[in-house]
Amino acid sequence: MTSTNALRLRAAIALPVLVGSLFAYSAAFAQSTGTQAAEVQELVVKGQRGPKVVGQVIAESAAKSRSSINQEFIATQIPGQTVLDAINLLPGVNFTNNDAYGSAGGDITLRGFDSQRIALLQDGIPLNDTGNYAIYSNQQLDSELIDRVTVNLGTTDVDSPTAAAAGGTINYVSAKPKQDMGAAITLQGGTENFRRVFARVDTGAVGPFGTTAYLSAAKATNDLFMGPGGIDKMQVNGRVYQELSNGDFMSLMFNYNENRNNFIRRATLAQFNTNTIPVYDSTCVRPSASGVAGGTAQIDISCSNFYRNNINPSNTGNIRGQSSFTLSDKLRATIDPSFQYVLANGGGRTVFKESDAQFRTPTDLNGDGDTLDSVMIYWPNTTNTHRVGVTSSLIYKLSDTSNVRLAYTYDHGIHRQTGEAVPFNAAGDPTNVFGGKDSFGNPIRLSDGTILRRRDRTSIADLNQFAVEYRARYFSDKLLVNAGVRAPYFQRNMTNYCYQRDTFTAYCTTQTPTSVDAAGLVTFAVSAQNTSAANKYGTPRSFTRKYNKVLPNLGLSYEVAENQTLYASYAESISAPRTDDLYDQKLVNPAPETTTAFDIGYRYQTGKVVGAVAIFSNSFENRIVRTFDEENGIFNSRNVGKVELKGVDGQVGWEPLDGLSLYASASYITTELQSNLPNGLNGAIIATKGKELVEIPKLQASIRAEYKIGDFSFGLQGKQVGDRYSNDLNTEKAPAYTLWDANVRYVLPQIGAAKSSLQLNVKNMLDEKYLGDISSGSGSAAGSFQPGYPRAVVLTLRSEF
């Protein structure tokens, strides 16, 4: 049977259940085309008719811990919401959304690992920042275009195109164009002046080859729920899909996203407890330039809390190709090329005297004809990335029950970090949100001809990865063996064009420095950005860092009885040091972080109940943290030892009655640091041995109930998050909280060809007061917190034609 016919068969006899979500595109909850093709072949061999879906739980067959959701469940959430919020009910996942609508950012943890140690992929291509591996939740694909999402808990797939996935992977897959011509539009309105429109047009099958395509666009705006400012987001997407014979296909997709956001001001735990959370200022009055040479000195105030200075603009986009070709009756090739573009910063401002020593000679910053003033300027940290990659596989069918796959991944990212300064205009906005970057704005040029900038450095990251995987069934198909190994070879070529005090503080100047030691460190005269003549800086330099490791993974599953399966998995992963770990005053070379993950799990799958439970243990080696160097008065990156993460998690879906489905998940995670942190000279330490990781809730639980009757559907869901520590010594913690959400949908009577529905969503229905994302404190220092969003109500009208 061809994979195309298999898909048709599954679609024809798919279980009529379901409630949170019926998935009929493919049963391969995988990332790349190669992984998908290998797993589709496995399912055809096994004779499965499509995954069972009960109460949101999708029945998994992989020999590892994995959870998935699909579009039918995603559609019950607020349309346009970030995809990471949609997976928040899954076991082991904790996503803290900065607002109710998904465009203000957020943070995610997975089985005890933070977002910089989790790989996020879109159609198999890596989306993490190429420098610090951060995940930007507000830049993800419009939710209407996501077919399914798969979470590998603590492991990767054998061809995962990443050198930074110690904690697991999250991959979401784009929807295919429809076979019939049509259009869809979504109109939304809600609290905080939320407005959104989404439109999609499908060509249907056109031309002599039956090519299908779609184009979509979305626009969303809302006010911040706390303080002045707002969110403005625009996104455009498209896909062309060409089905060939024998299950072969070619596809080309693109995504472009723009965000223009103001930040919500963070708070301390004390401010939260006393209900005194501050907000950013709505006004800032600064003196105007006199326009007279030799006039009076104007002194700008810093306006550090002015909301228009605290912005987070981003332009991001990618082009993604996918293809699968049958080379013979036993051999298949897949090729997935990609290109990505990122331009973003987090705002910033500073005040310079026009006679500042950093300039060498006085410079007229505000154009008033003199150099007597103190002028506030826009001072961003801008990141610009150009990234190309390809993931490819050759899959050879050894027999009807086994195959072997060879995979190769290449990922090349040019990661440019700059900070070209520009003035503010009369309204208090920067003349360009991206500063003087390239052709966006006019940078401030100093008297010596150089550009005034906050930092200036380049990282060129190259990943070459080879992998092999063997997949087979034995003993009347009861035993599944999945064995593989991947070998990533990762290299960073790094150049810093400025002087560096620590990883966060660069000093870009043409001043003549004073050498102070044999290590090549230098000092400068006091200036606005160099507050002490004793501060030491490393000189501009270029250097290379290389990392490689052979990473095995093994998975076994055995059908011990009808509808019951036991599985076990072992996997090793790596997370190479981030750019922030490498740019420093002195050359540093921390070893890559590594993990060893063990899972033992049980699955029960029938027509009415689908469930899974797993016990896991993860050893996290060579953890990189920034510890204090007392001699130089700065923090350096270094390896500080091991962390043990252990726990149990599970989920169950149950359909007790027609139209009623129930879902529940729970996670219990313990984390323990095995070492103390060095803290300066003479053996001083921060006593972290035996302490828990920050930001990680020990206990989480989720529930959801959904009921469908006639043209109505009703949903209620809750997520409980336990206490989370907010400093290294565990002396401060954010309190536990529970959020309840609800959704109601009514299918309107059809008028002509139009099919419409109204949907009401309520987020944080009980208006819980809580703290979201945590920026943890070092030692016993207090952390800072993102205030949780209040109750939000959204009404959505969907129409398809």
Where are these regions (language model features)?
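C-terminal beta-signal and adjacent terminal beta-strands/loops
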Residues: 2-4, 719-726, 746-801
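N-terminal periplasmic "start-of-domain" segments of outer-membrane beta-barrel proteins
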Residues: 42-78, 107, 149-151
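Extracytoplasmic beta-strand/coil segments of soluble accessory domains associated
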Residues: 46, 82-126, 147, 154
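A beta-strand signature from Gram-negative outer-membrane beta-barrel systems
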Residues: 140-186
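Acidic/polar loop-and-plug regions of large Gram-negative outer-membrane beta-barrel proteins
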Residues: 224, 241-243, 249-324, 341, ...
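Structural signature of Gram-negative outer-membrane beta-barrels, strongest in the C-terminal barrel
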Residues: 385-387, 395-413, 426, 436, ...
